[in-house]
Design a protein with these regions (language model features):
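Short beta-strand to alpha-helix junction loop
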Residues: 1, 7, 46-51, 78-81, ...
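A glycine-rich dinucleotide-binding beta-alpha-beta segment and adjacent secondary-structure elements
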Residues: 8, 183-256
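Short hydrophobic core segments
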Residues: 12, 31-51, 59-60, 110-116, ...
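Central helical "cap/lid" subdomain
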Residues: 48-73, 104
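An anion/pyrophosphate-binding glycine-rich loop and adjacent beta-alpha core
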Residues: 64-68, 75-201
Length: 256
């Protein structure tokens, strides 16, 4: 037996190196002596589970370099103007975070529209790059079954011919649900009325709708907080620890 003593419900507030060992101090005044210390306190994600970032402060107080925690693998908050009324709709999509003209990250998968913005695995994997002022580009054409934007455009023109007398609001029937179809048309500045027919679609209208379906730009306002995040980015610098042993390079007996 290793004769390890397990102590629970104790908050460690300070860690000091003394002689050849370590002393940990708790909030209620207890002192714990050890030859080695392993810090595995997690980040700030899901604080209701006890992950509040306090373990990182123990390291930074010892001079260990670190990066501030930030929510990662979480939902992205966007401007809600163009996605109003789409909450609950799931689609296959390609999403990318754009900073000016640079693509910072791109993912494929299922996207879920929400009142605050968008969610889904592909969105959450982009969250660490999402910042206020950047854009989230959403492409739906491949999820609709098309190889590229050109094939989508050709389908629109084919429907204009074959469905000339059908209501224009039905132009995307079979490709997406009516609520999403209406939102795409609004974003593409289609002025659809009850009397509008598919045969009245112009080449310019087809081009605008194609651009919207292939590169719908949603202004990013931020991300959901640590309460919603599955993980947090940031933390102690990995360069400060030996990758083979996880021991601190400067402080013997300290592991993280």
């Amino acid at each position: 037996a290793l004769h390890v003593r397990v102590v629970t419900s104790v908050s460690i507030t300070a860690l000091h190196r003394e002689n050849d060992g370590w002393t940990a101090l708790s909030a209620d005044g207890q002192r714990f002596r050890a030859n080695r210390v392993i810090i595995s306190g997690g980040g700030c994600a899901q604080p209701k589970l006890g992950s509040d970032g306090s373990a990182l402060r123990l390291l930074t107080n010892l001079g260990c370099p670190a990066t501030t925690f930030a929510p990662a693998l979480t939902q992205i908050i966007t401007d809600s103007t163009s996605i109003k009324g789409l909450s609950g709709i799931r689609v296959k999509a390609q999403v990318a975070v754009i900073d000016r003209k640079s693509v910072l990250n791109e993912e494929d998968g299922e996207l879920l529209f929400a009142d605050y913005g968008v969610s889904g695995v592909c969105v959450m994997q982009c969250a660490r790059y999402a910042k206020d002022g950047r854009m989230l580009r959403v492409s739906l054409v491949k999820g609709m079954g098309f190889a590229d934007a050109g094939e989508f455009r050709r389908e629109l023109h084919q429907r204009r011919k074959n469905w000339a007398q059908r209501p224009m609001a039905e132009m995307l029937t079979g490709l997406c649900v009516p609520r999403l179809s209406a939102a795409l048309m609004r974003q593409a500045d289609w002025r659809v009325t009850e009397s509008s027919l598919c045969g009245q679609m112009t080449a310019d209208m087809a081009e605008r709708l194609t651009k919207t379906a292939d590169a719908w730009l949603l202004p990013i306002r931020g991300v959901k907080g640590f309460e919603s995040a599955q993980v947090a980015s940031g933390g102690a610098s990995v360069a400060d620890f030996d990758p083979a042993t996880l021991q601190n390079r400067r402080l013997p007996g300290l592991y993280a």
